[in-house]
């Protein structure tokens, strides 16, 4: 059993589709989970139809959604790191490393969950996960936590091979769907299909939601 899990993502909702089930499992097992979210996703373009937010109010909307998602998963320790959305690739890498390093020093996690650097599609995803890996590379090997890395590019298996860990999360599917629903500003169309039953339970999307796959990051010594 893990002694402490640290989840590091750049945006609210990054945890919802690929990791919410595993996070919930850890919480249910009594494992302490800390979720560090680098930004509030305040530059997101989806503000609803009809509009539920303006550019000025969107940060608070997404902050509340993130808090609701954590409540759904049972995560009590949410850290909002205060970086600006869509700018992580332009931040001083040392500032990102320092910020994450302080969390690692404080929490001493046995496992970190983040995106897989260079396979995150979004520049913020790659910058955030690269900072996590750089932080850990500077640690003594014997103190370094395991990293469950989440690649989301279409070619991930062709390049990286099969995932090292695949978790069936059907036993916590209800909680995972509540987590997805919490981020309504980003998932409104999917939530509508889940709520009205129009999503085929055998669809590729439902299969994706029911299983979570990770690659253990291979540190080059």
Regions found by a protein language model. Name each.
Residues 1-107, 137-143:
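Active-site rim/loop-helix segments in enzyme catalytic domains that contact anionic ligands
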């Amino acid at each position: 059993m893990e002694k402490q899990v640290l989840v590091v993502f750049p945006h609210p909702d990054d945890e919802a589709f690929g990791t919410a089930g595993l996070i919930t499992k850890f919480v249910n097992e009594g494992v302490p989970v800390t979720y560090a979210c680098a930004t509030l996703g305040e530059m997101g373009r989806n503000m609803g139809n009809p509009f539920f937010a303006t550019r000025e109010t969107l940060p608070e909307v997404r902050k509340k959604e993130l808090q609701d998602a954590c409540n759904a998963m049972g995560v009590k320790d949410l850290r909002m790191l205060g970086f600006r959305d869509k700018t992580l690739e332009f931040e001083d890498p040392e500032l990102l490393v320092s910020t994450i390093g302080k969390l690692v020093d404080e929490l001493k996690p046995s496992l970190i969950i983040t995106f897989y650097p260079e396979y995150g599609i979004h520049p913020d995803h790659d910058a955030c996960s690269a900072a996590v890996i750089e932080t850990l590379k500077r640690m003594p090997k014997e103190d370094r936590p395991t990293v469950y890395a989440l690649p989301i590019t279409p070619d991930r298996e062709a390049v990286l091979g099969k995932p090292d860990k695949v978790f069936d999360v059907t036993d916590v599917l209800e909680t995972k769907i509540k987590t997805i629903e919490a981020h309504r500003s980003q998932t409104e169309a999917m939530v509508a299909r889940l709520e009205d039953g129009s999503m085929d339970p055998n669809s590729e999307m439902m299969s994706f939601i029911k299983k979570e796959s990770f690659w253990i990051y291979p540190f080059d010594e």
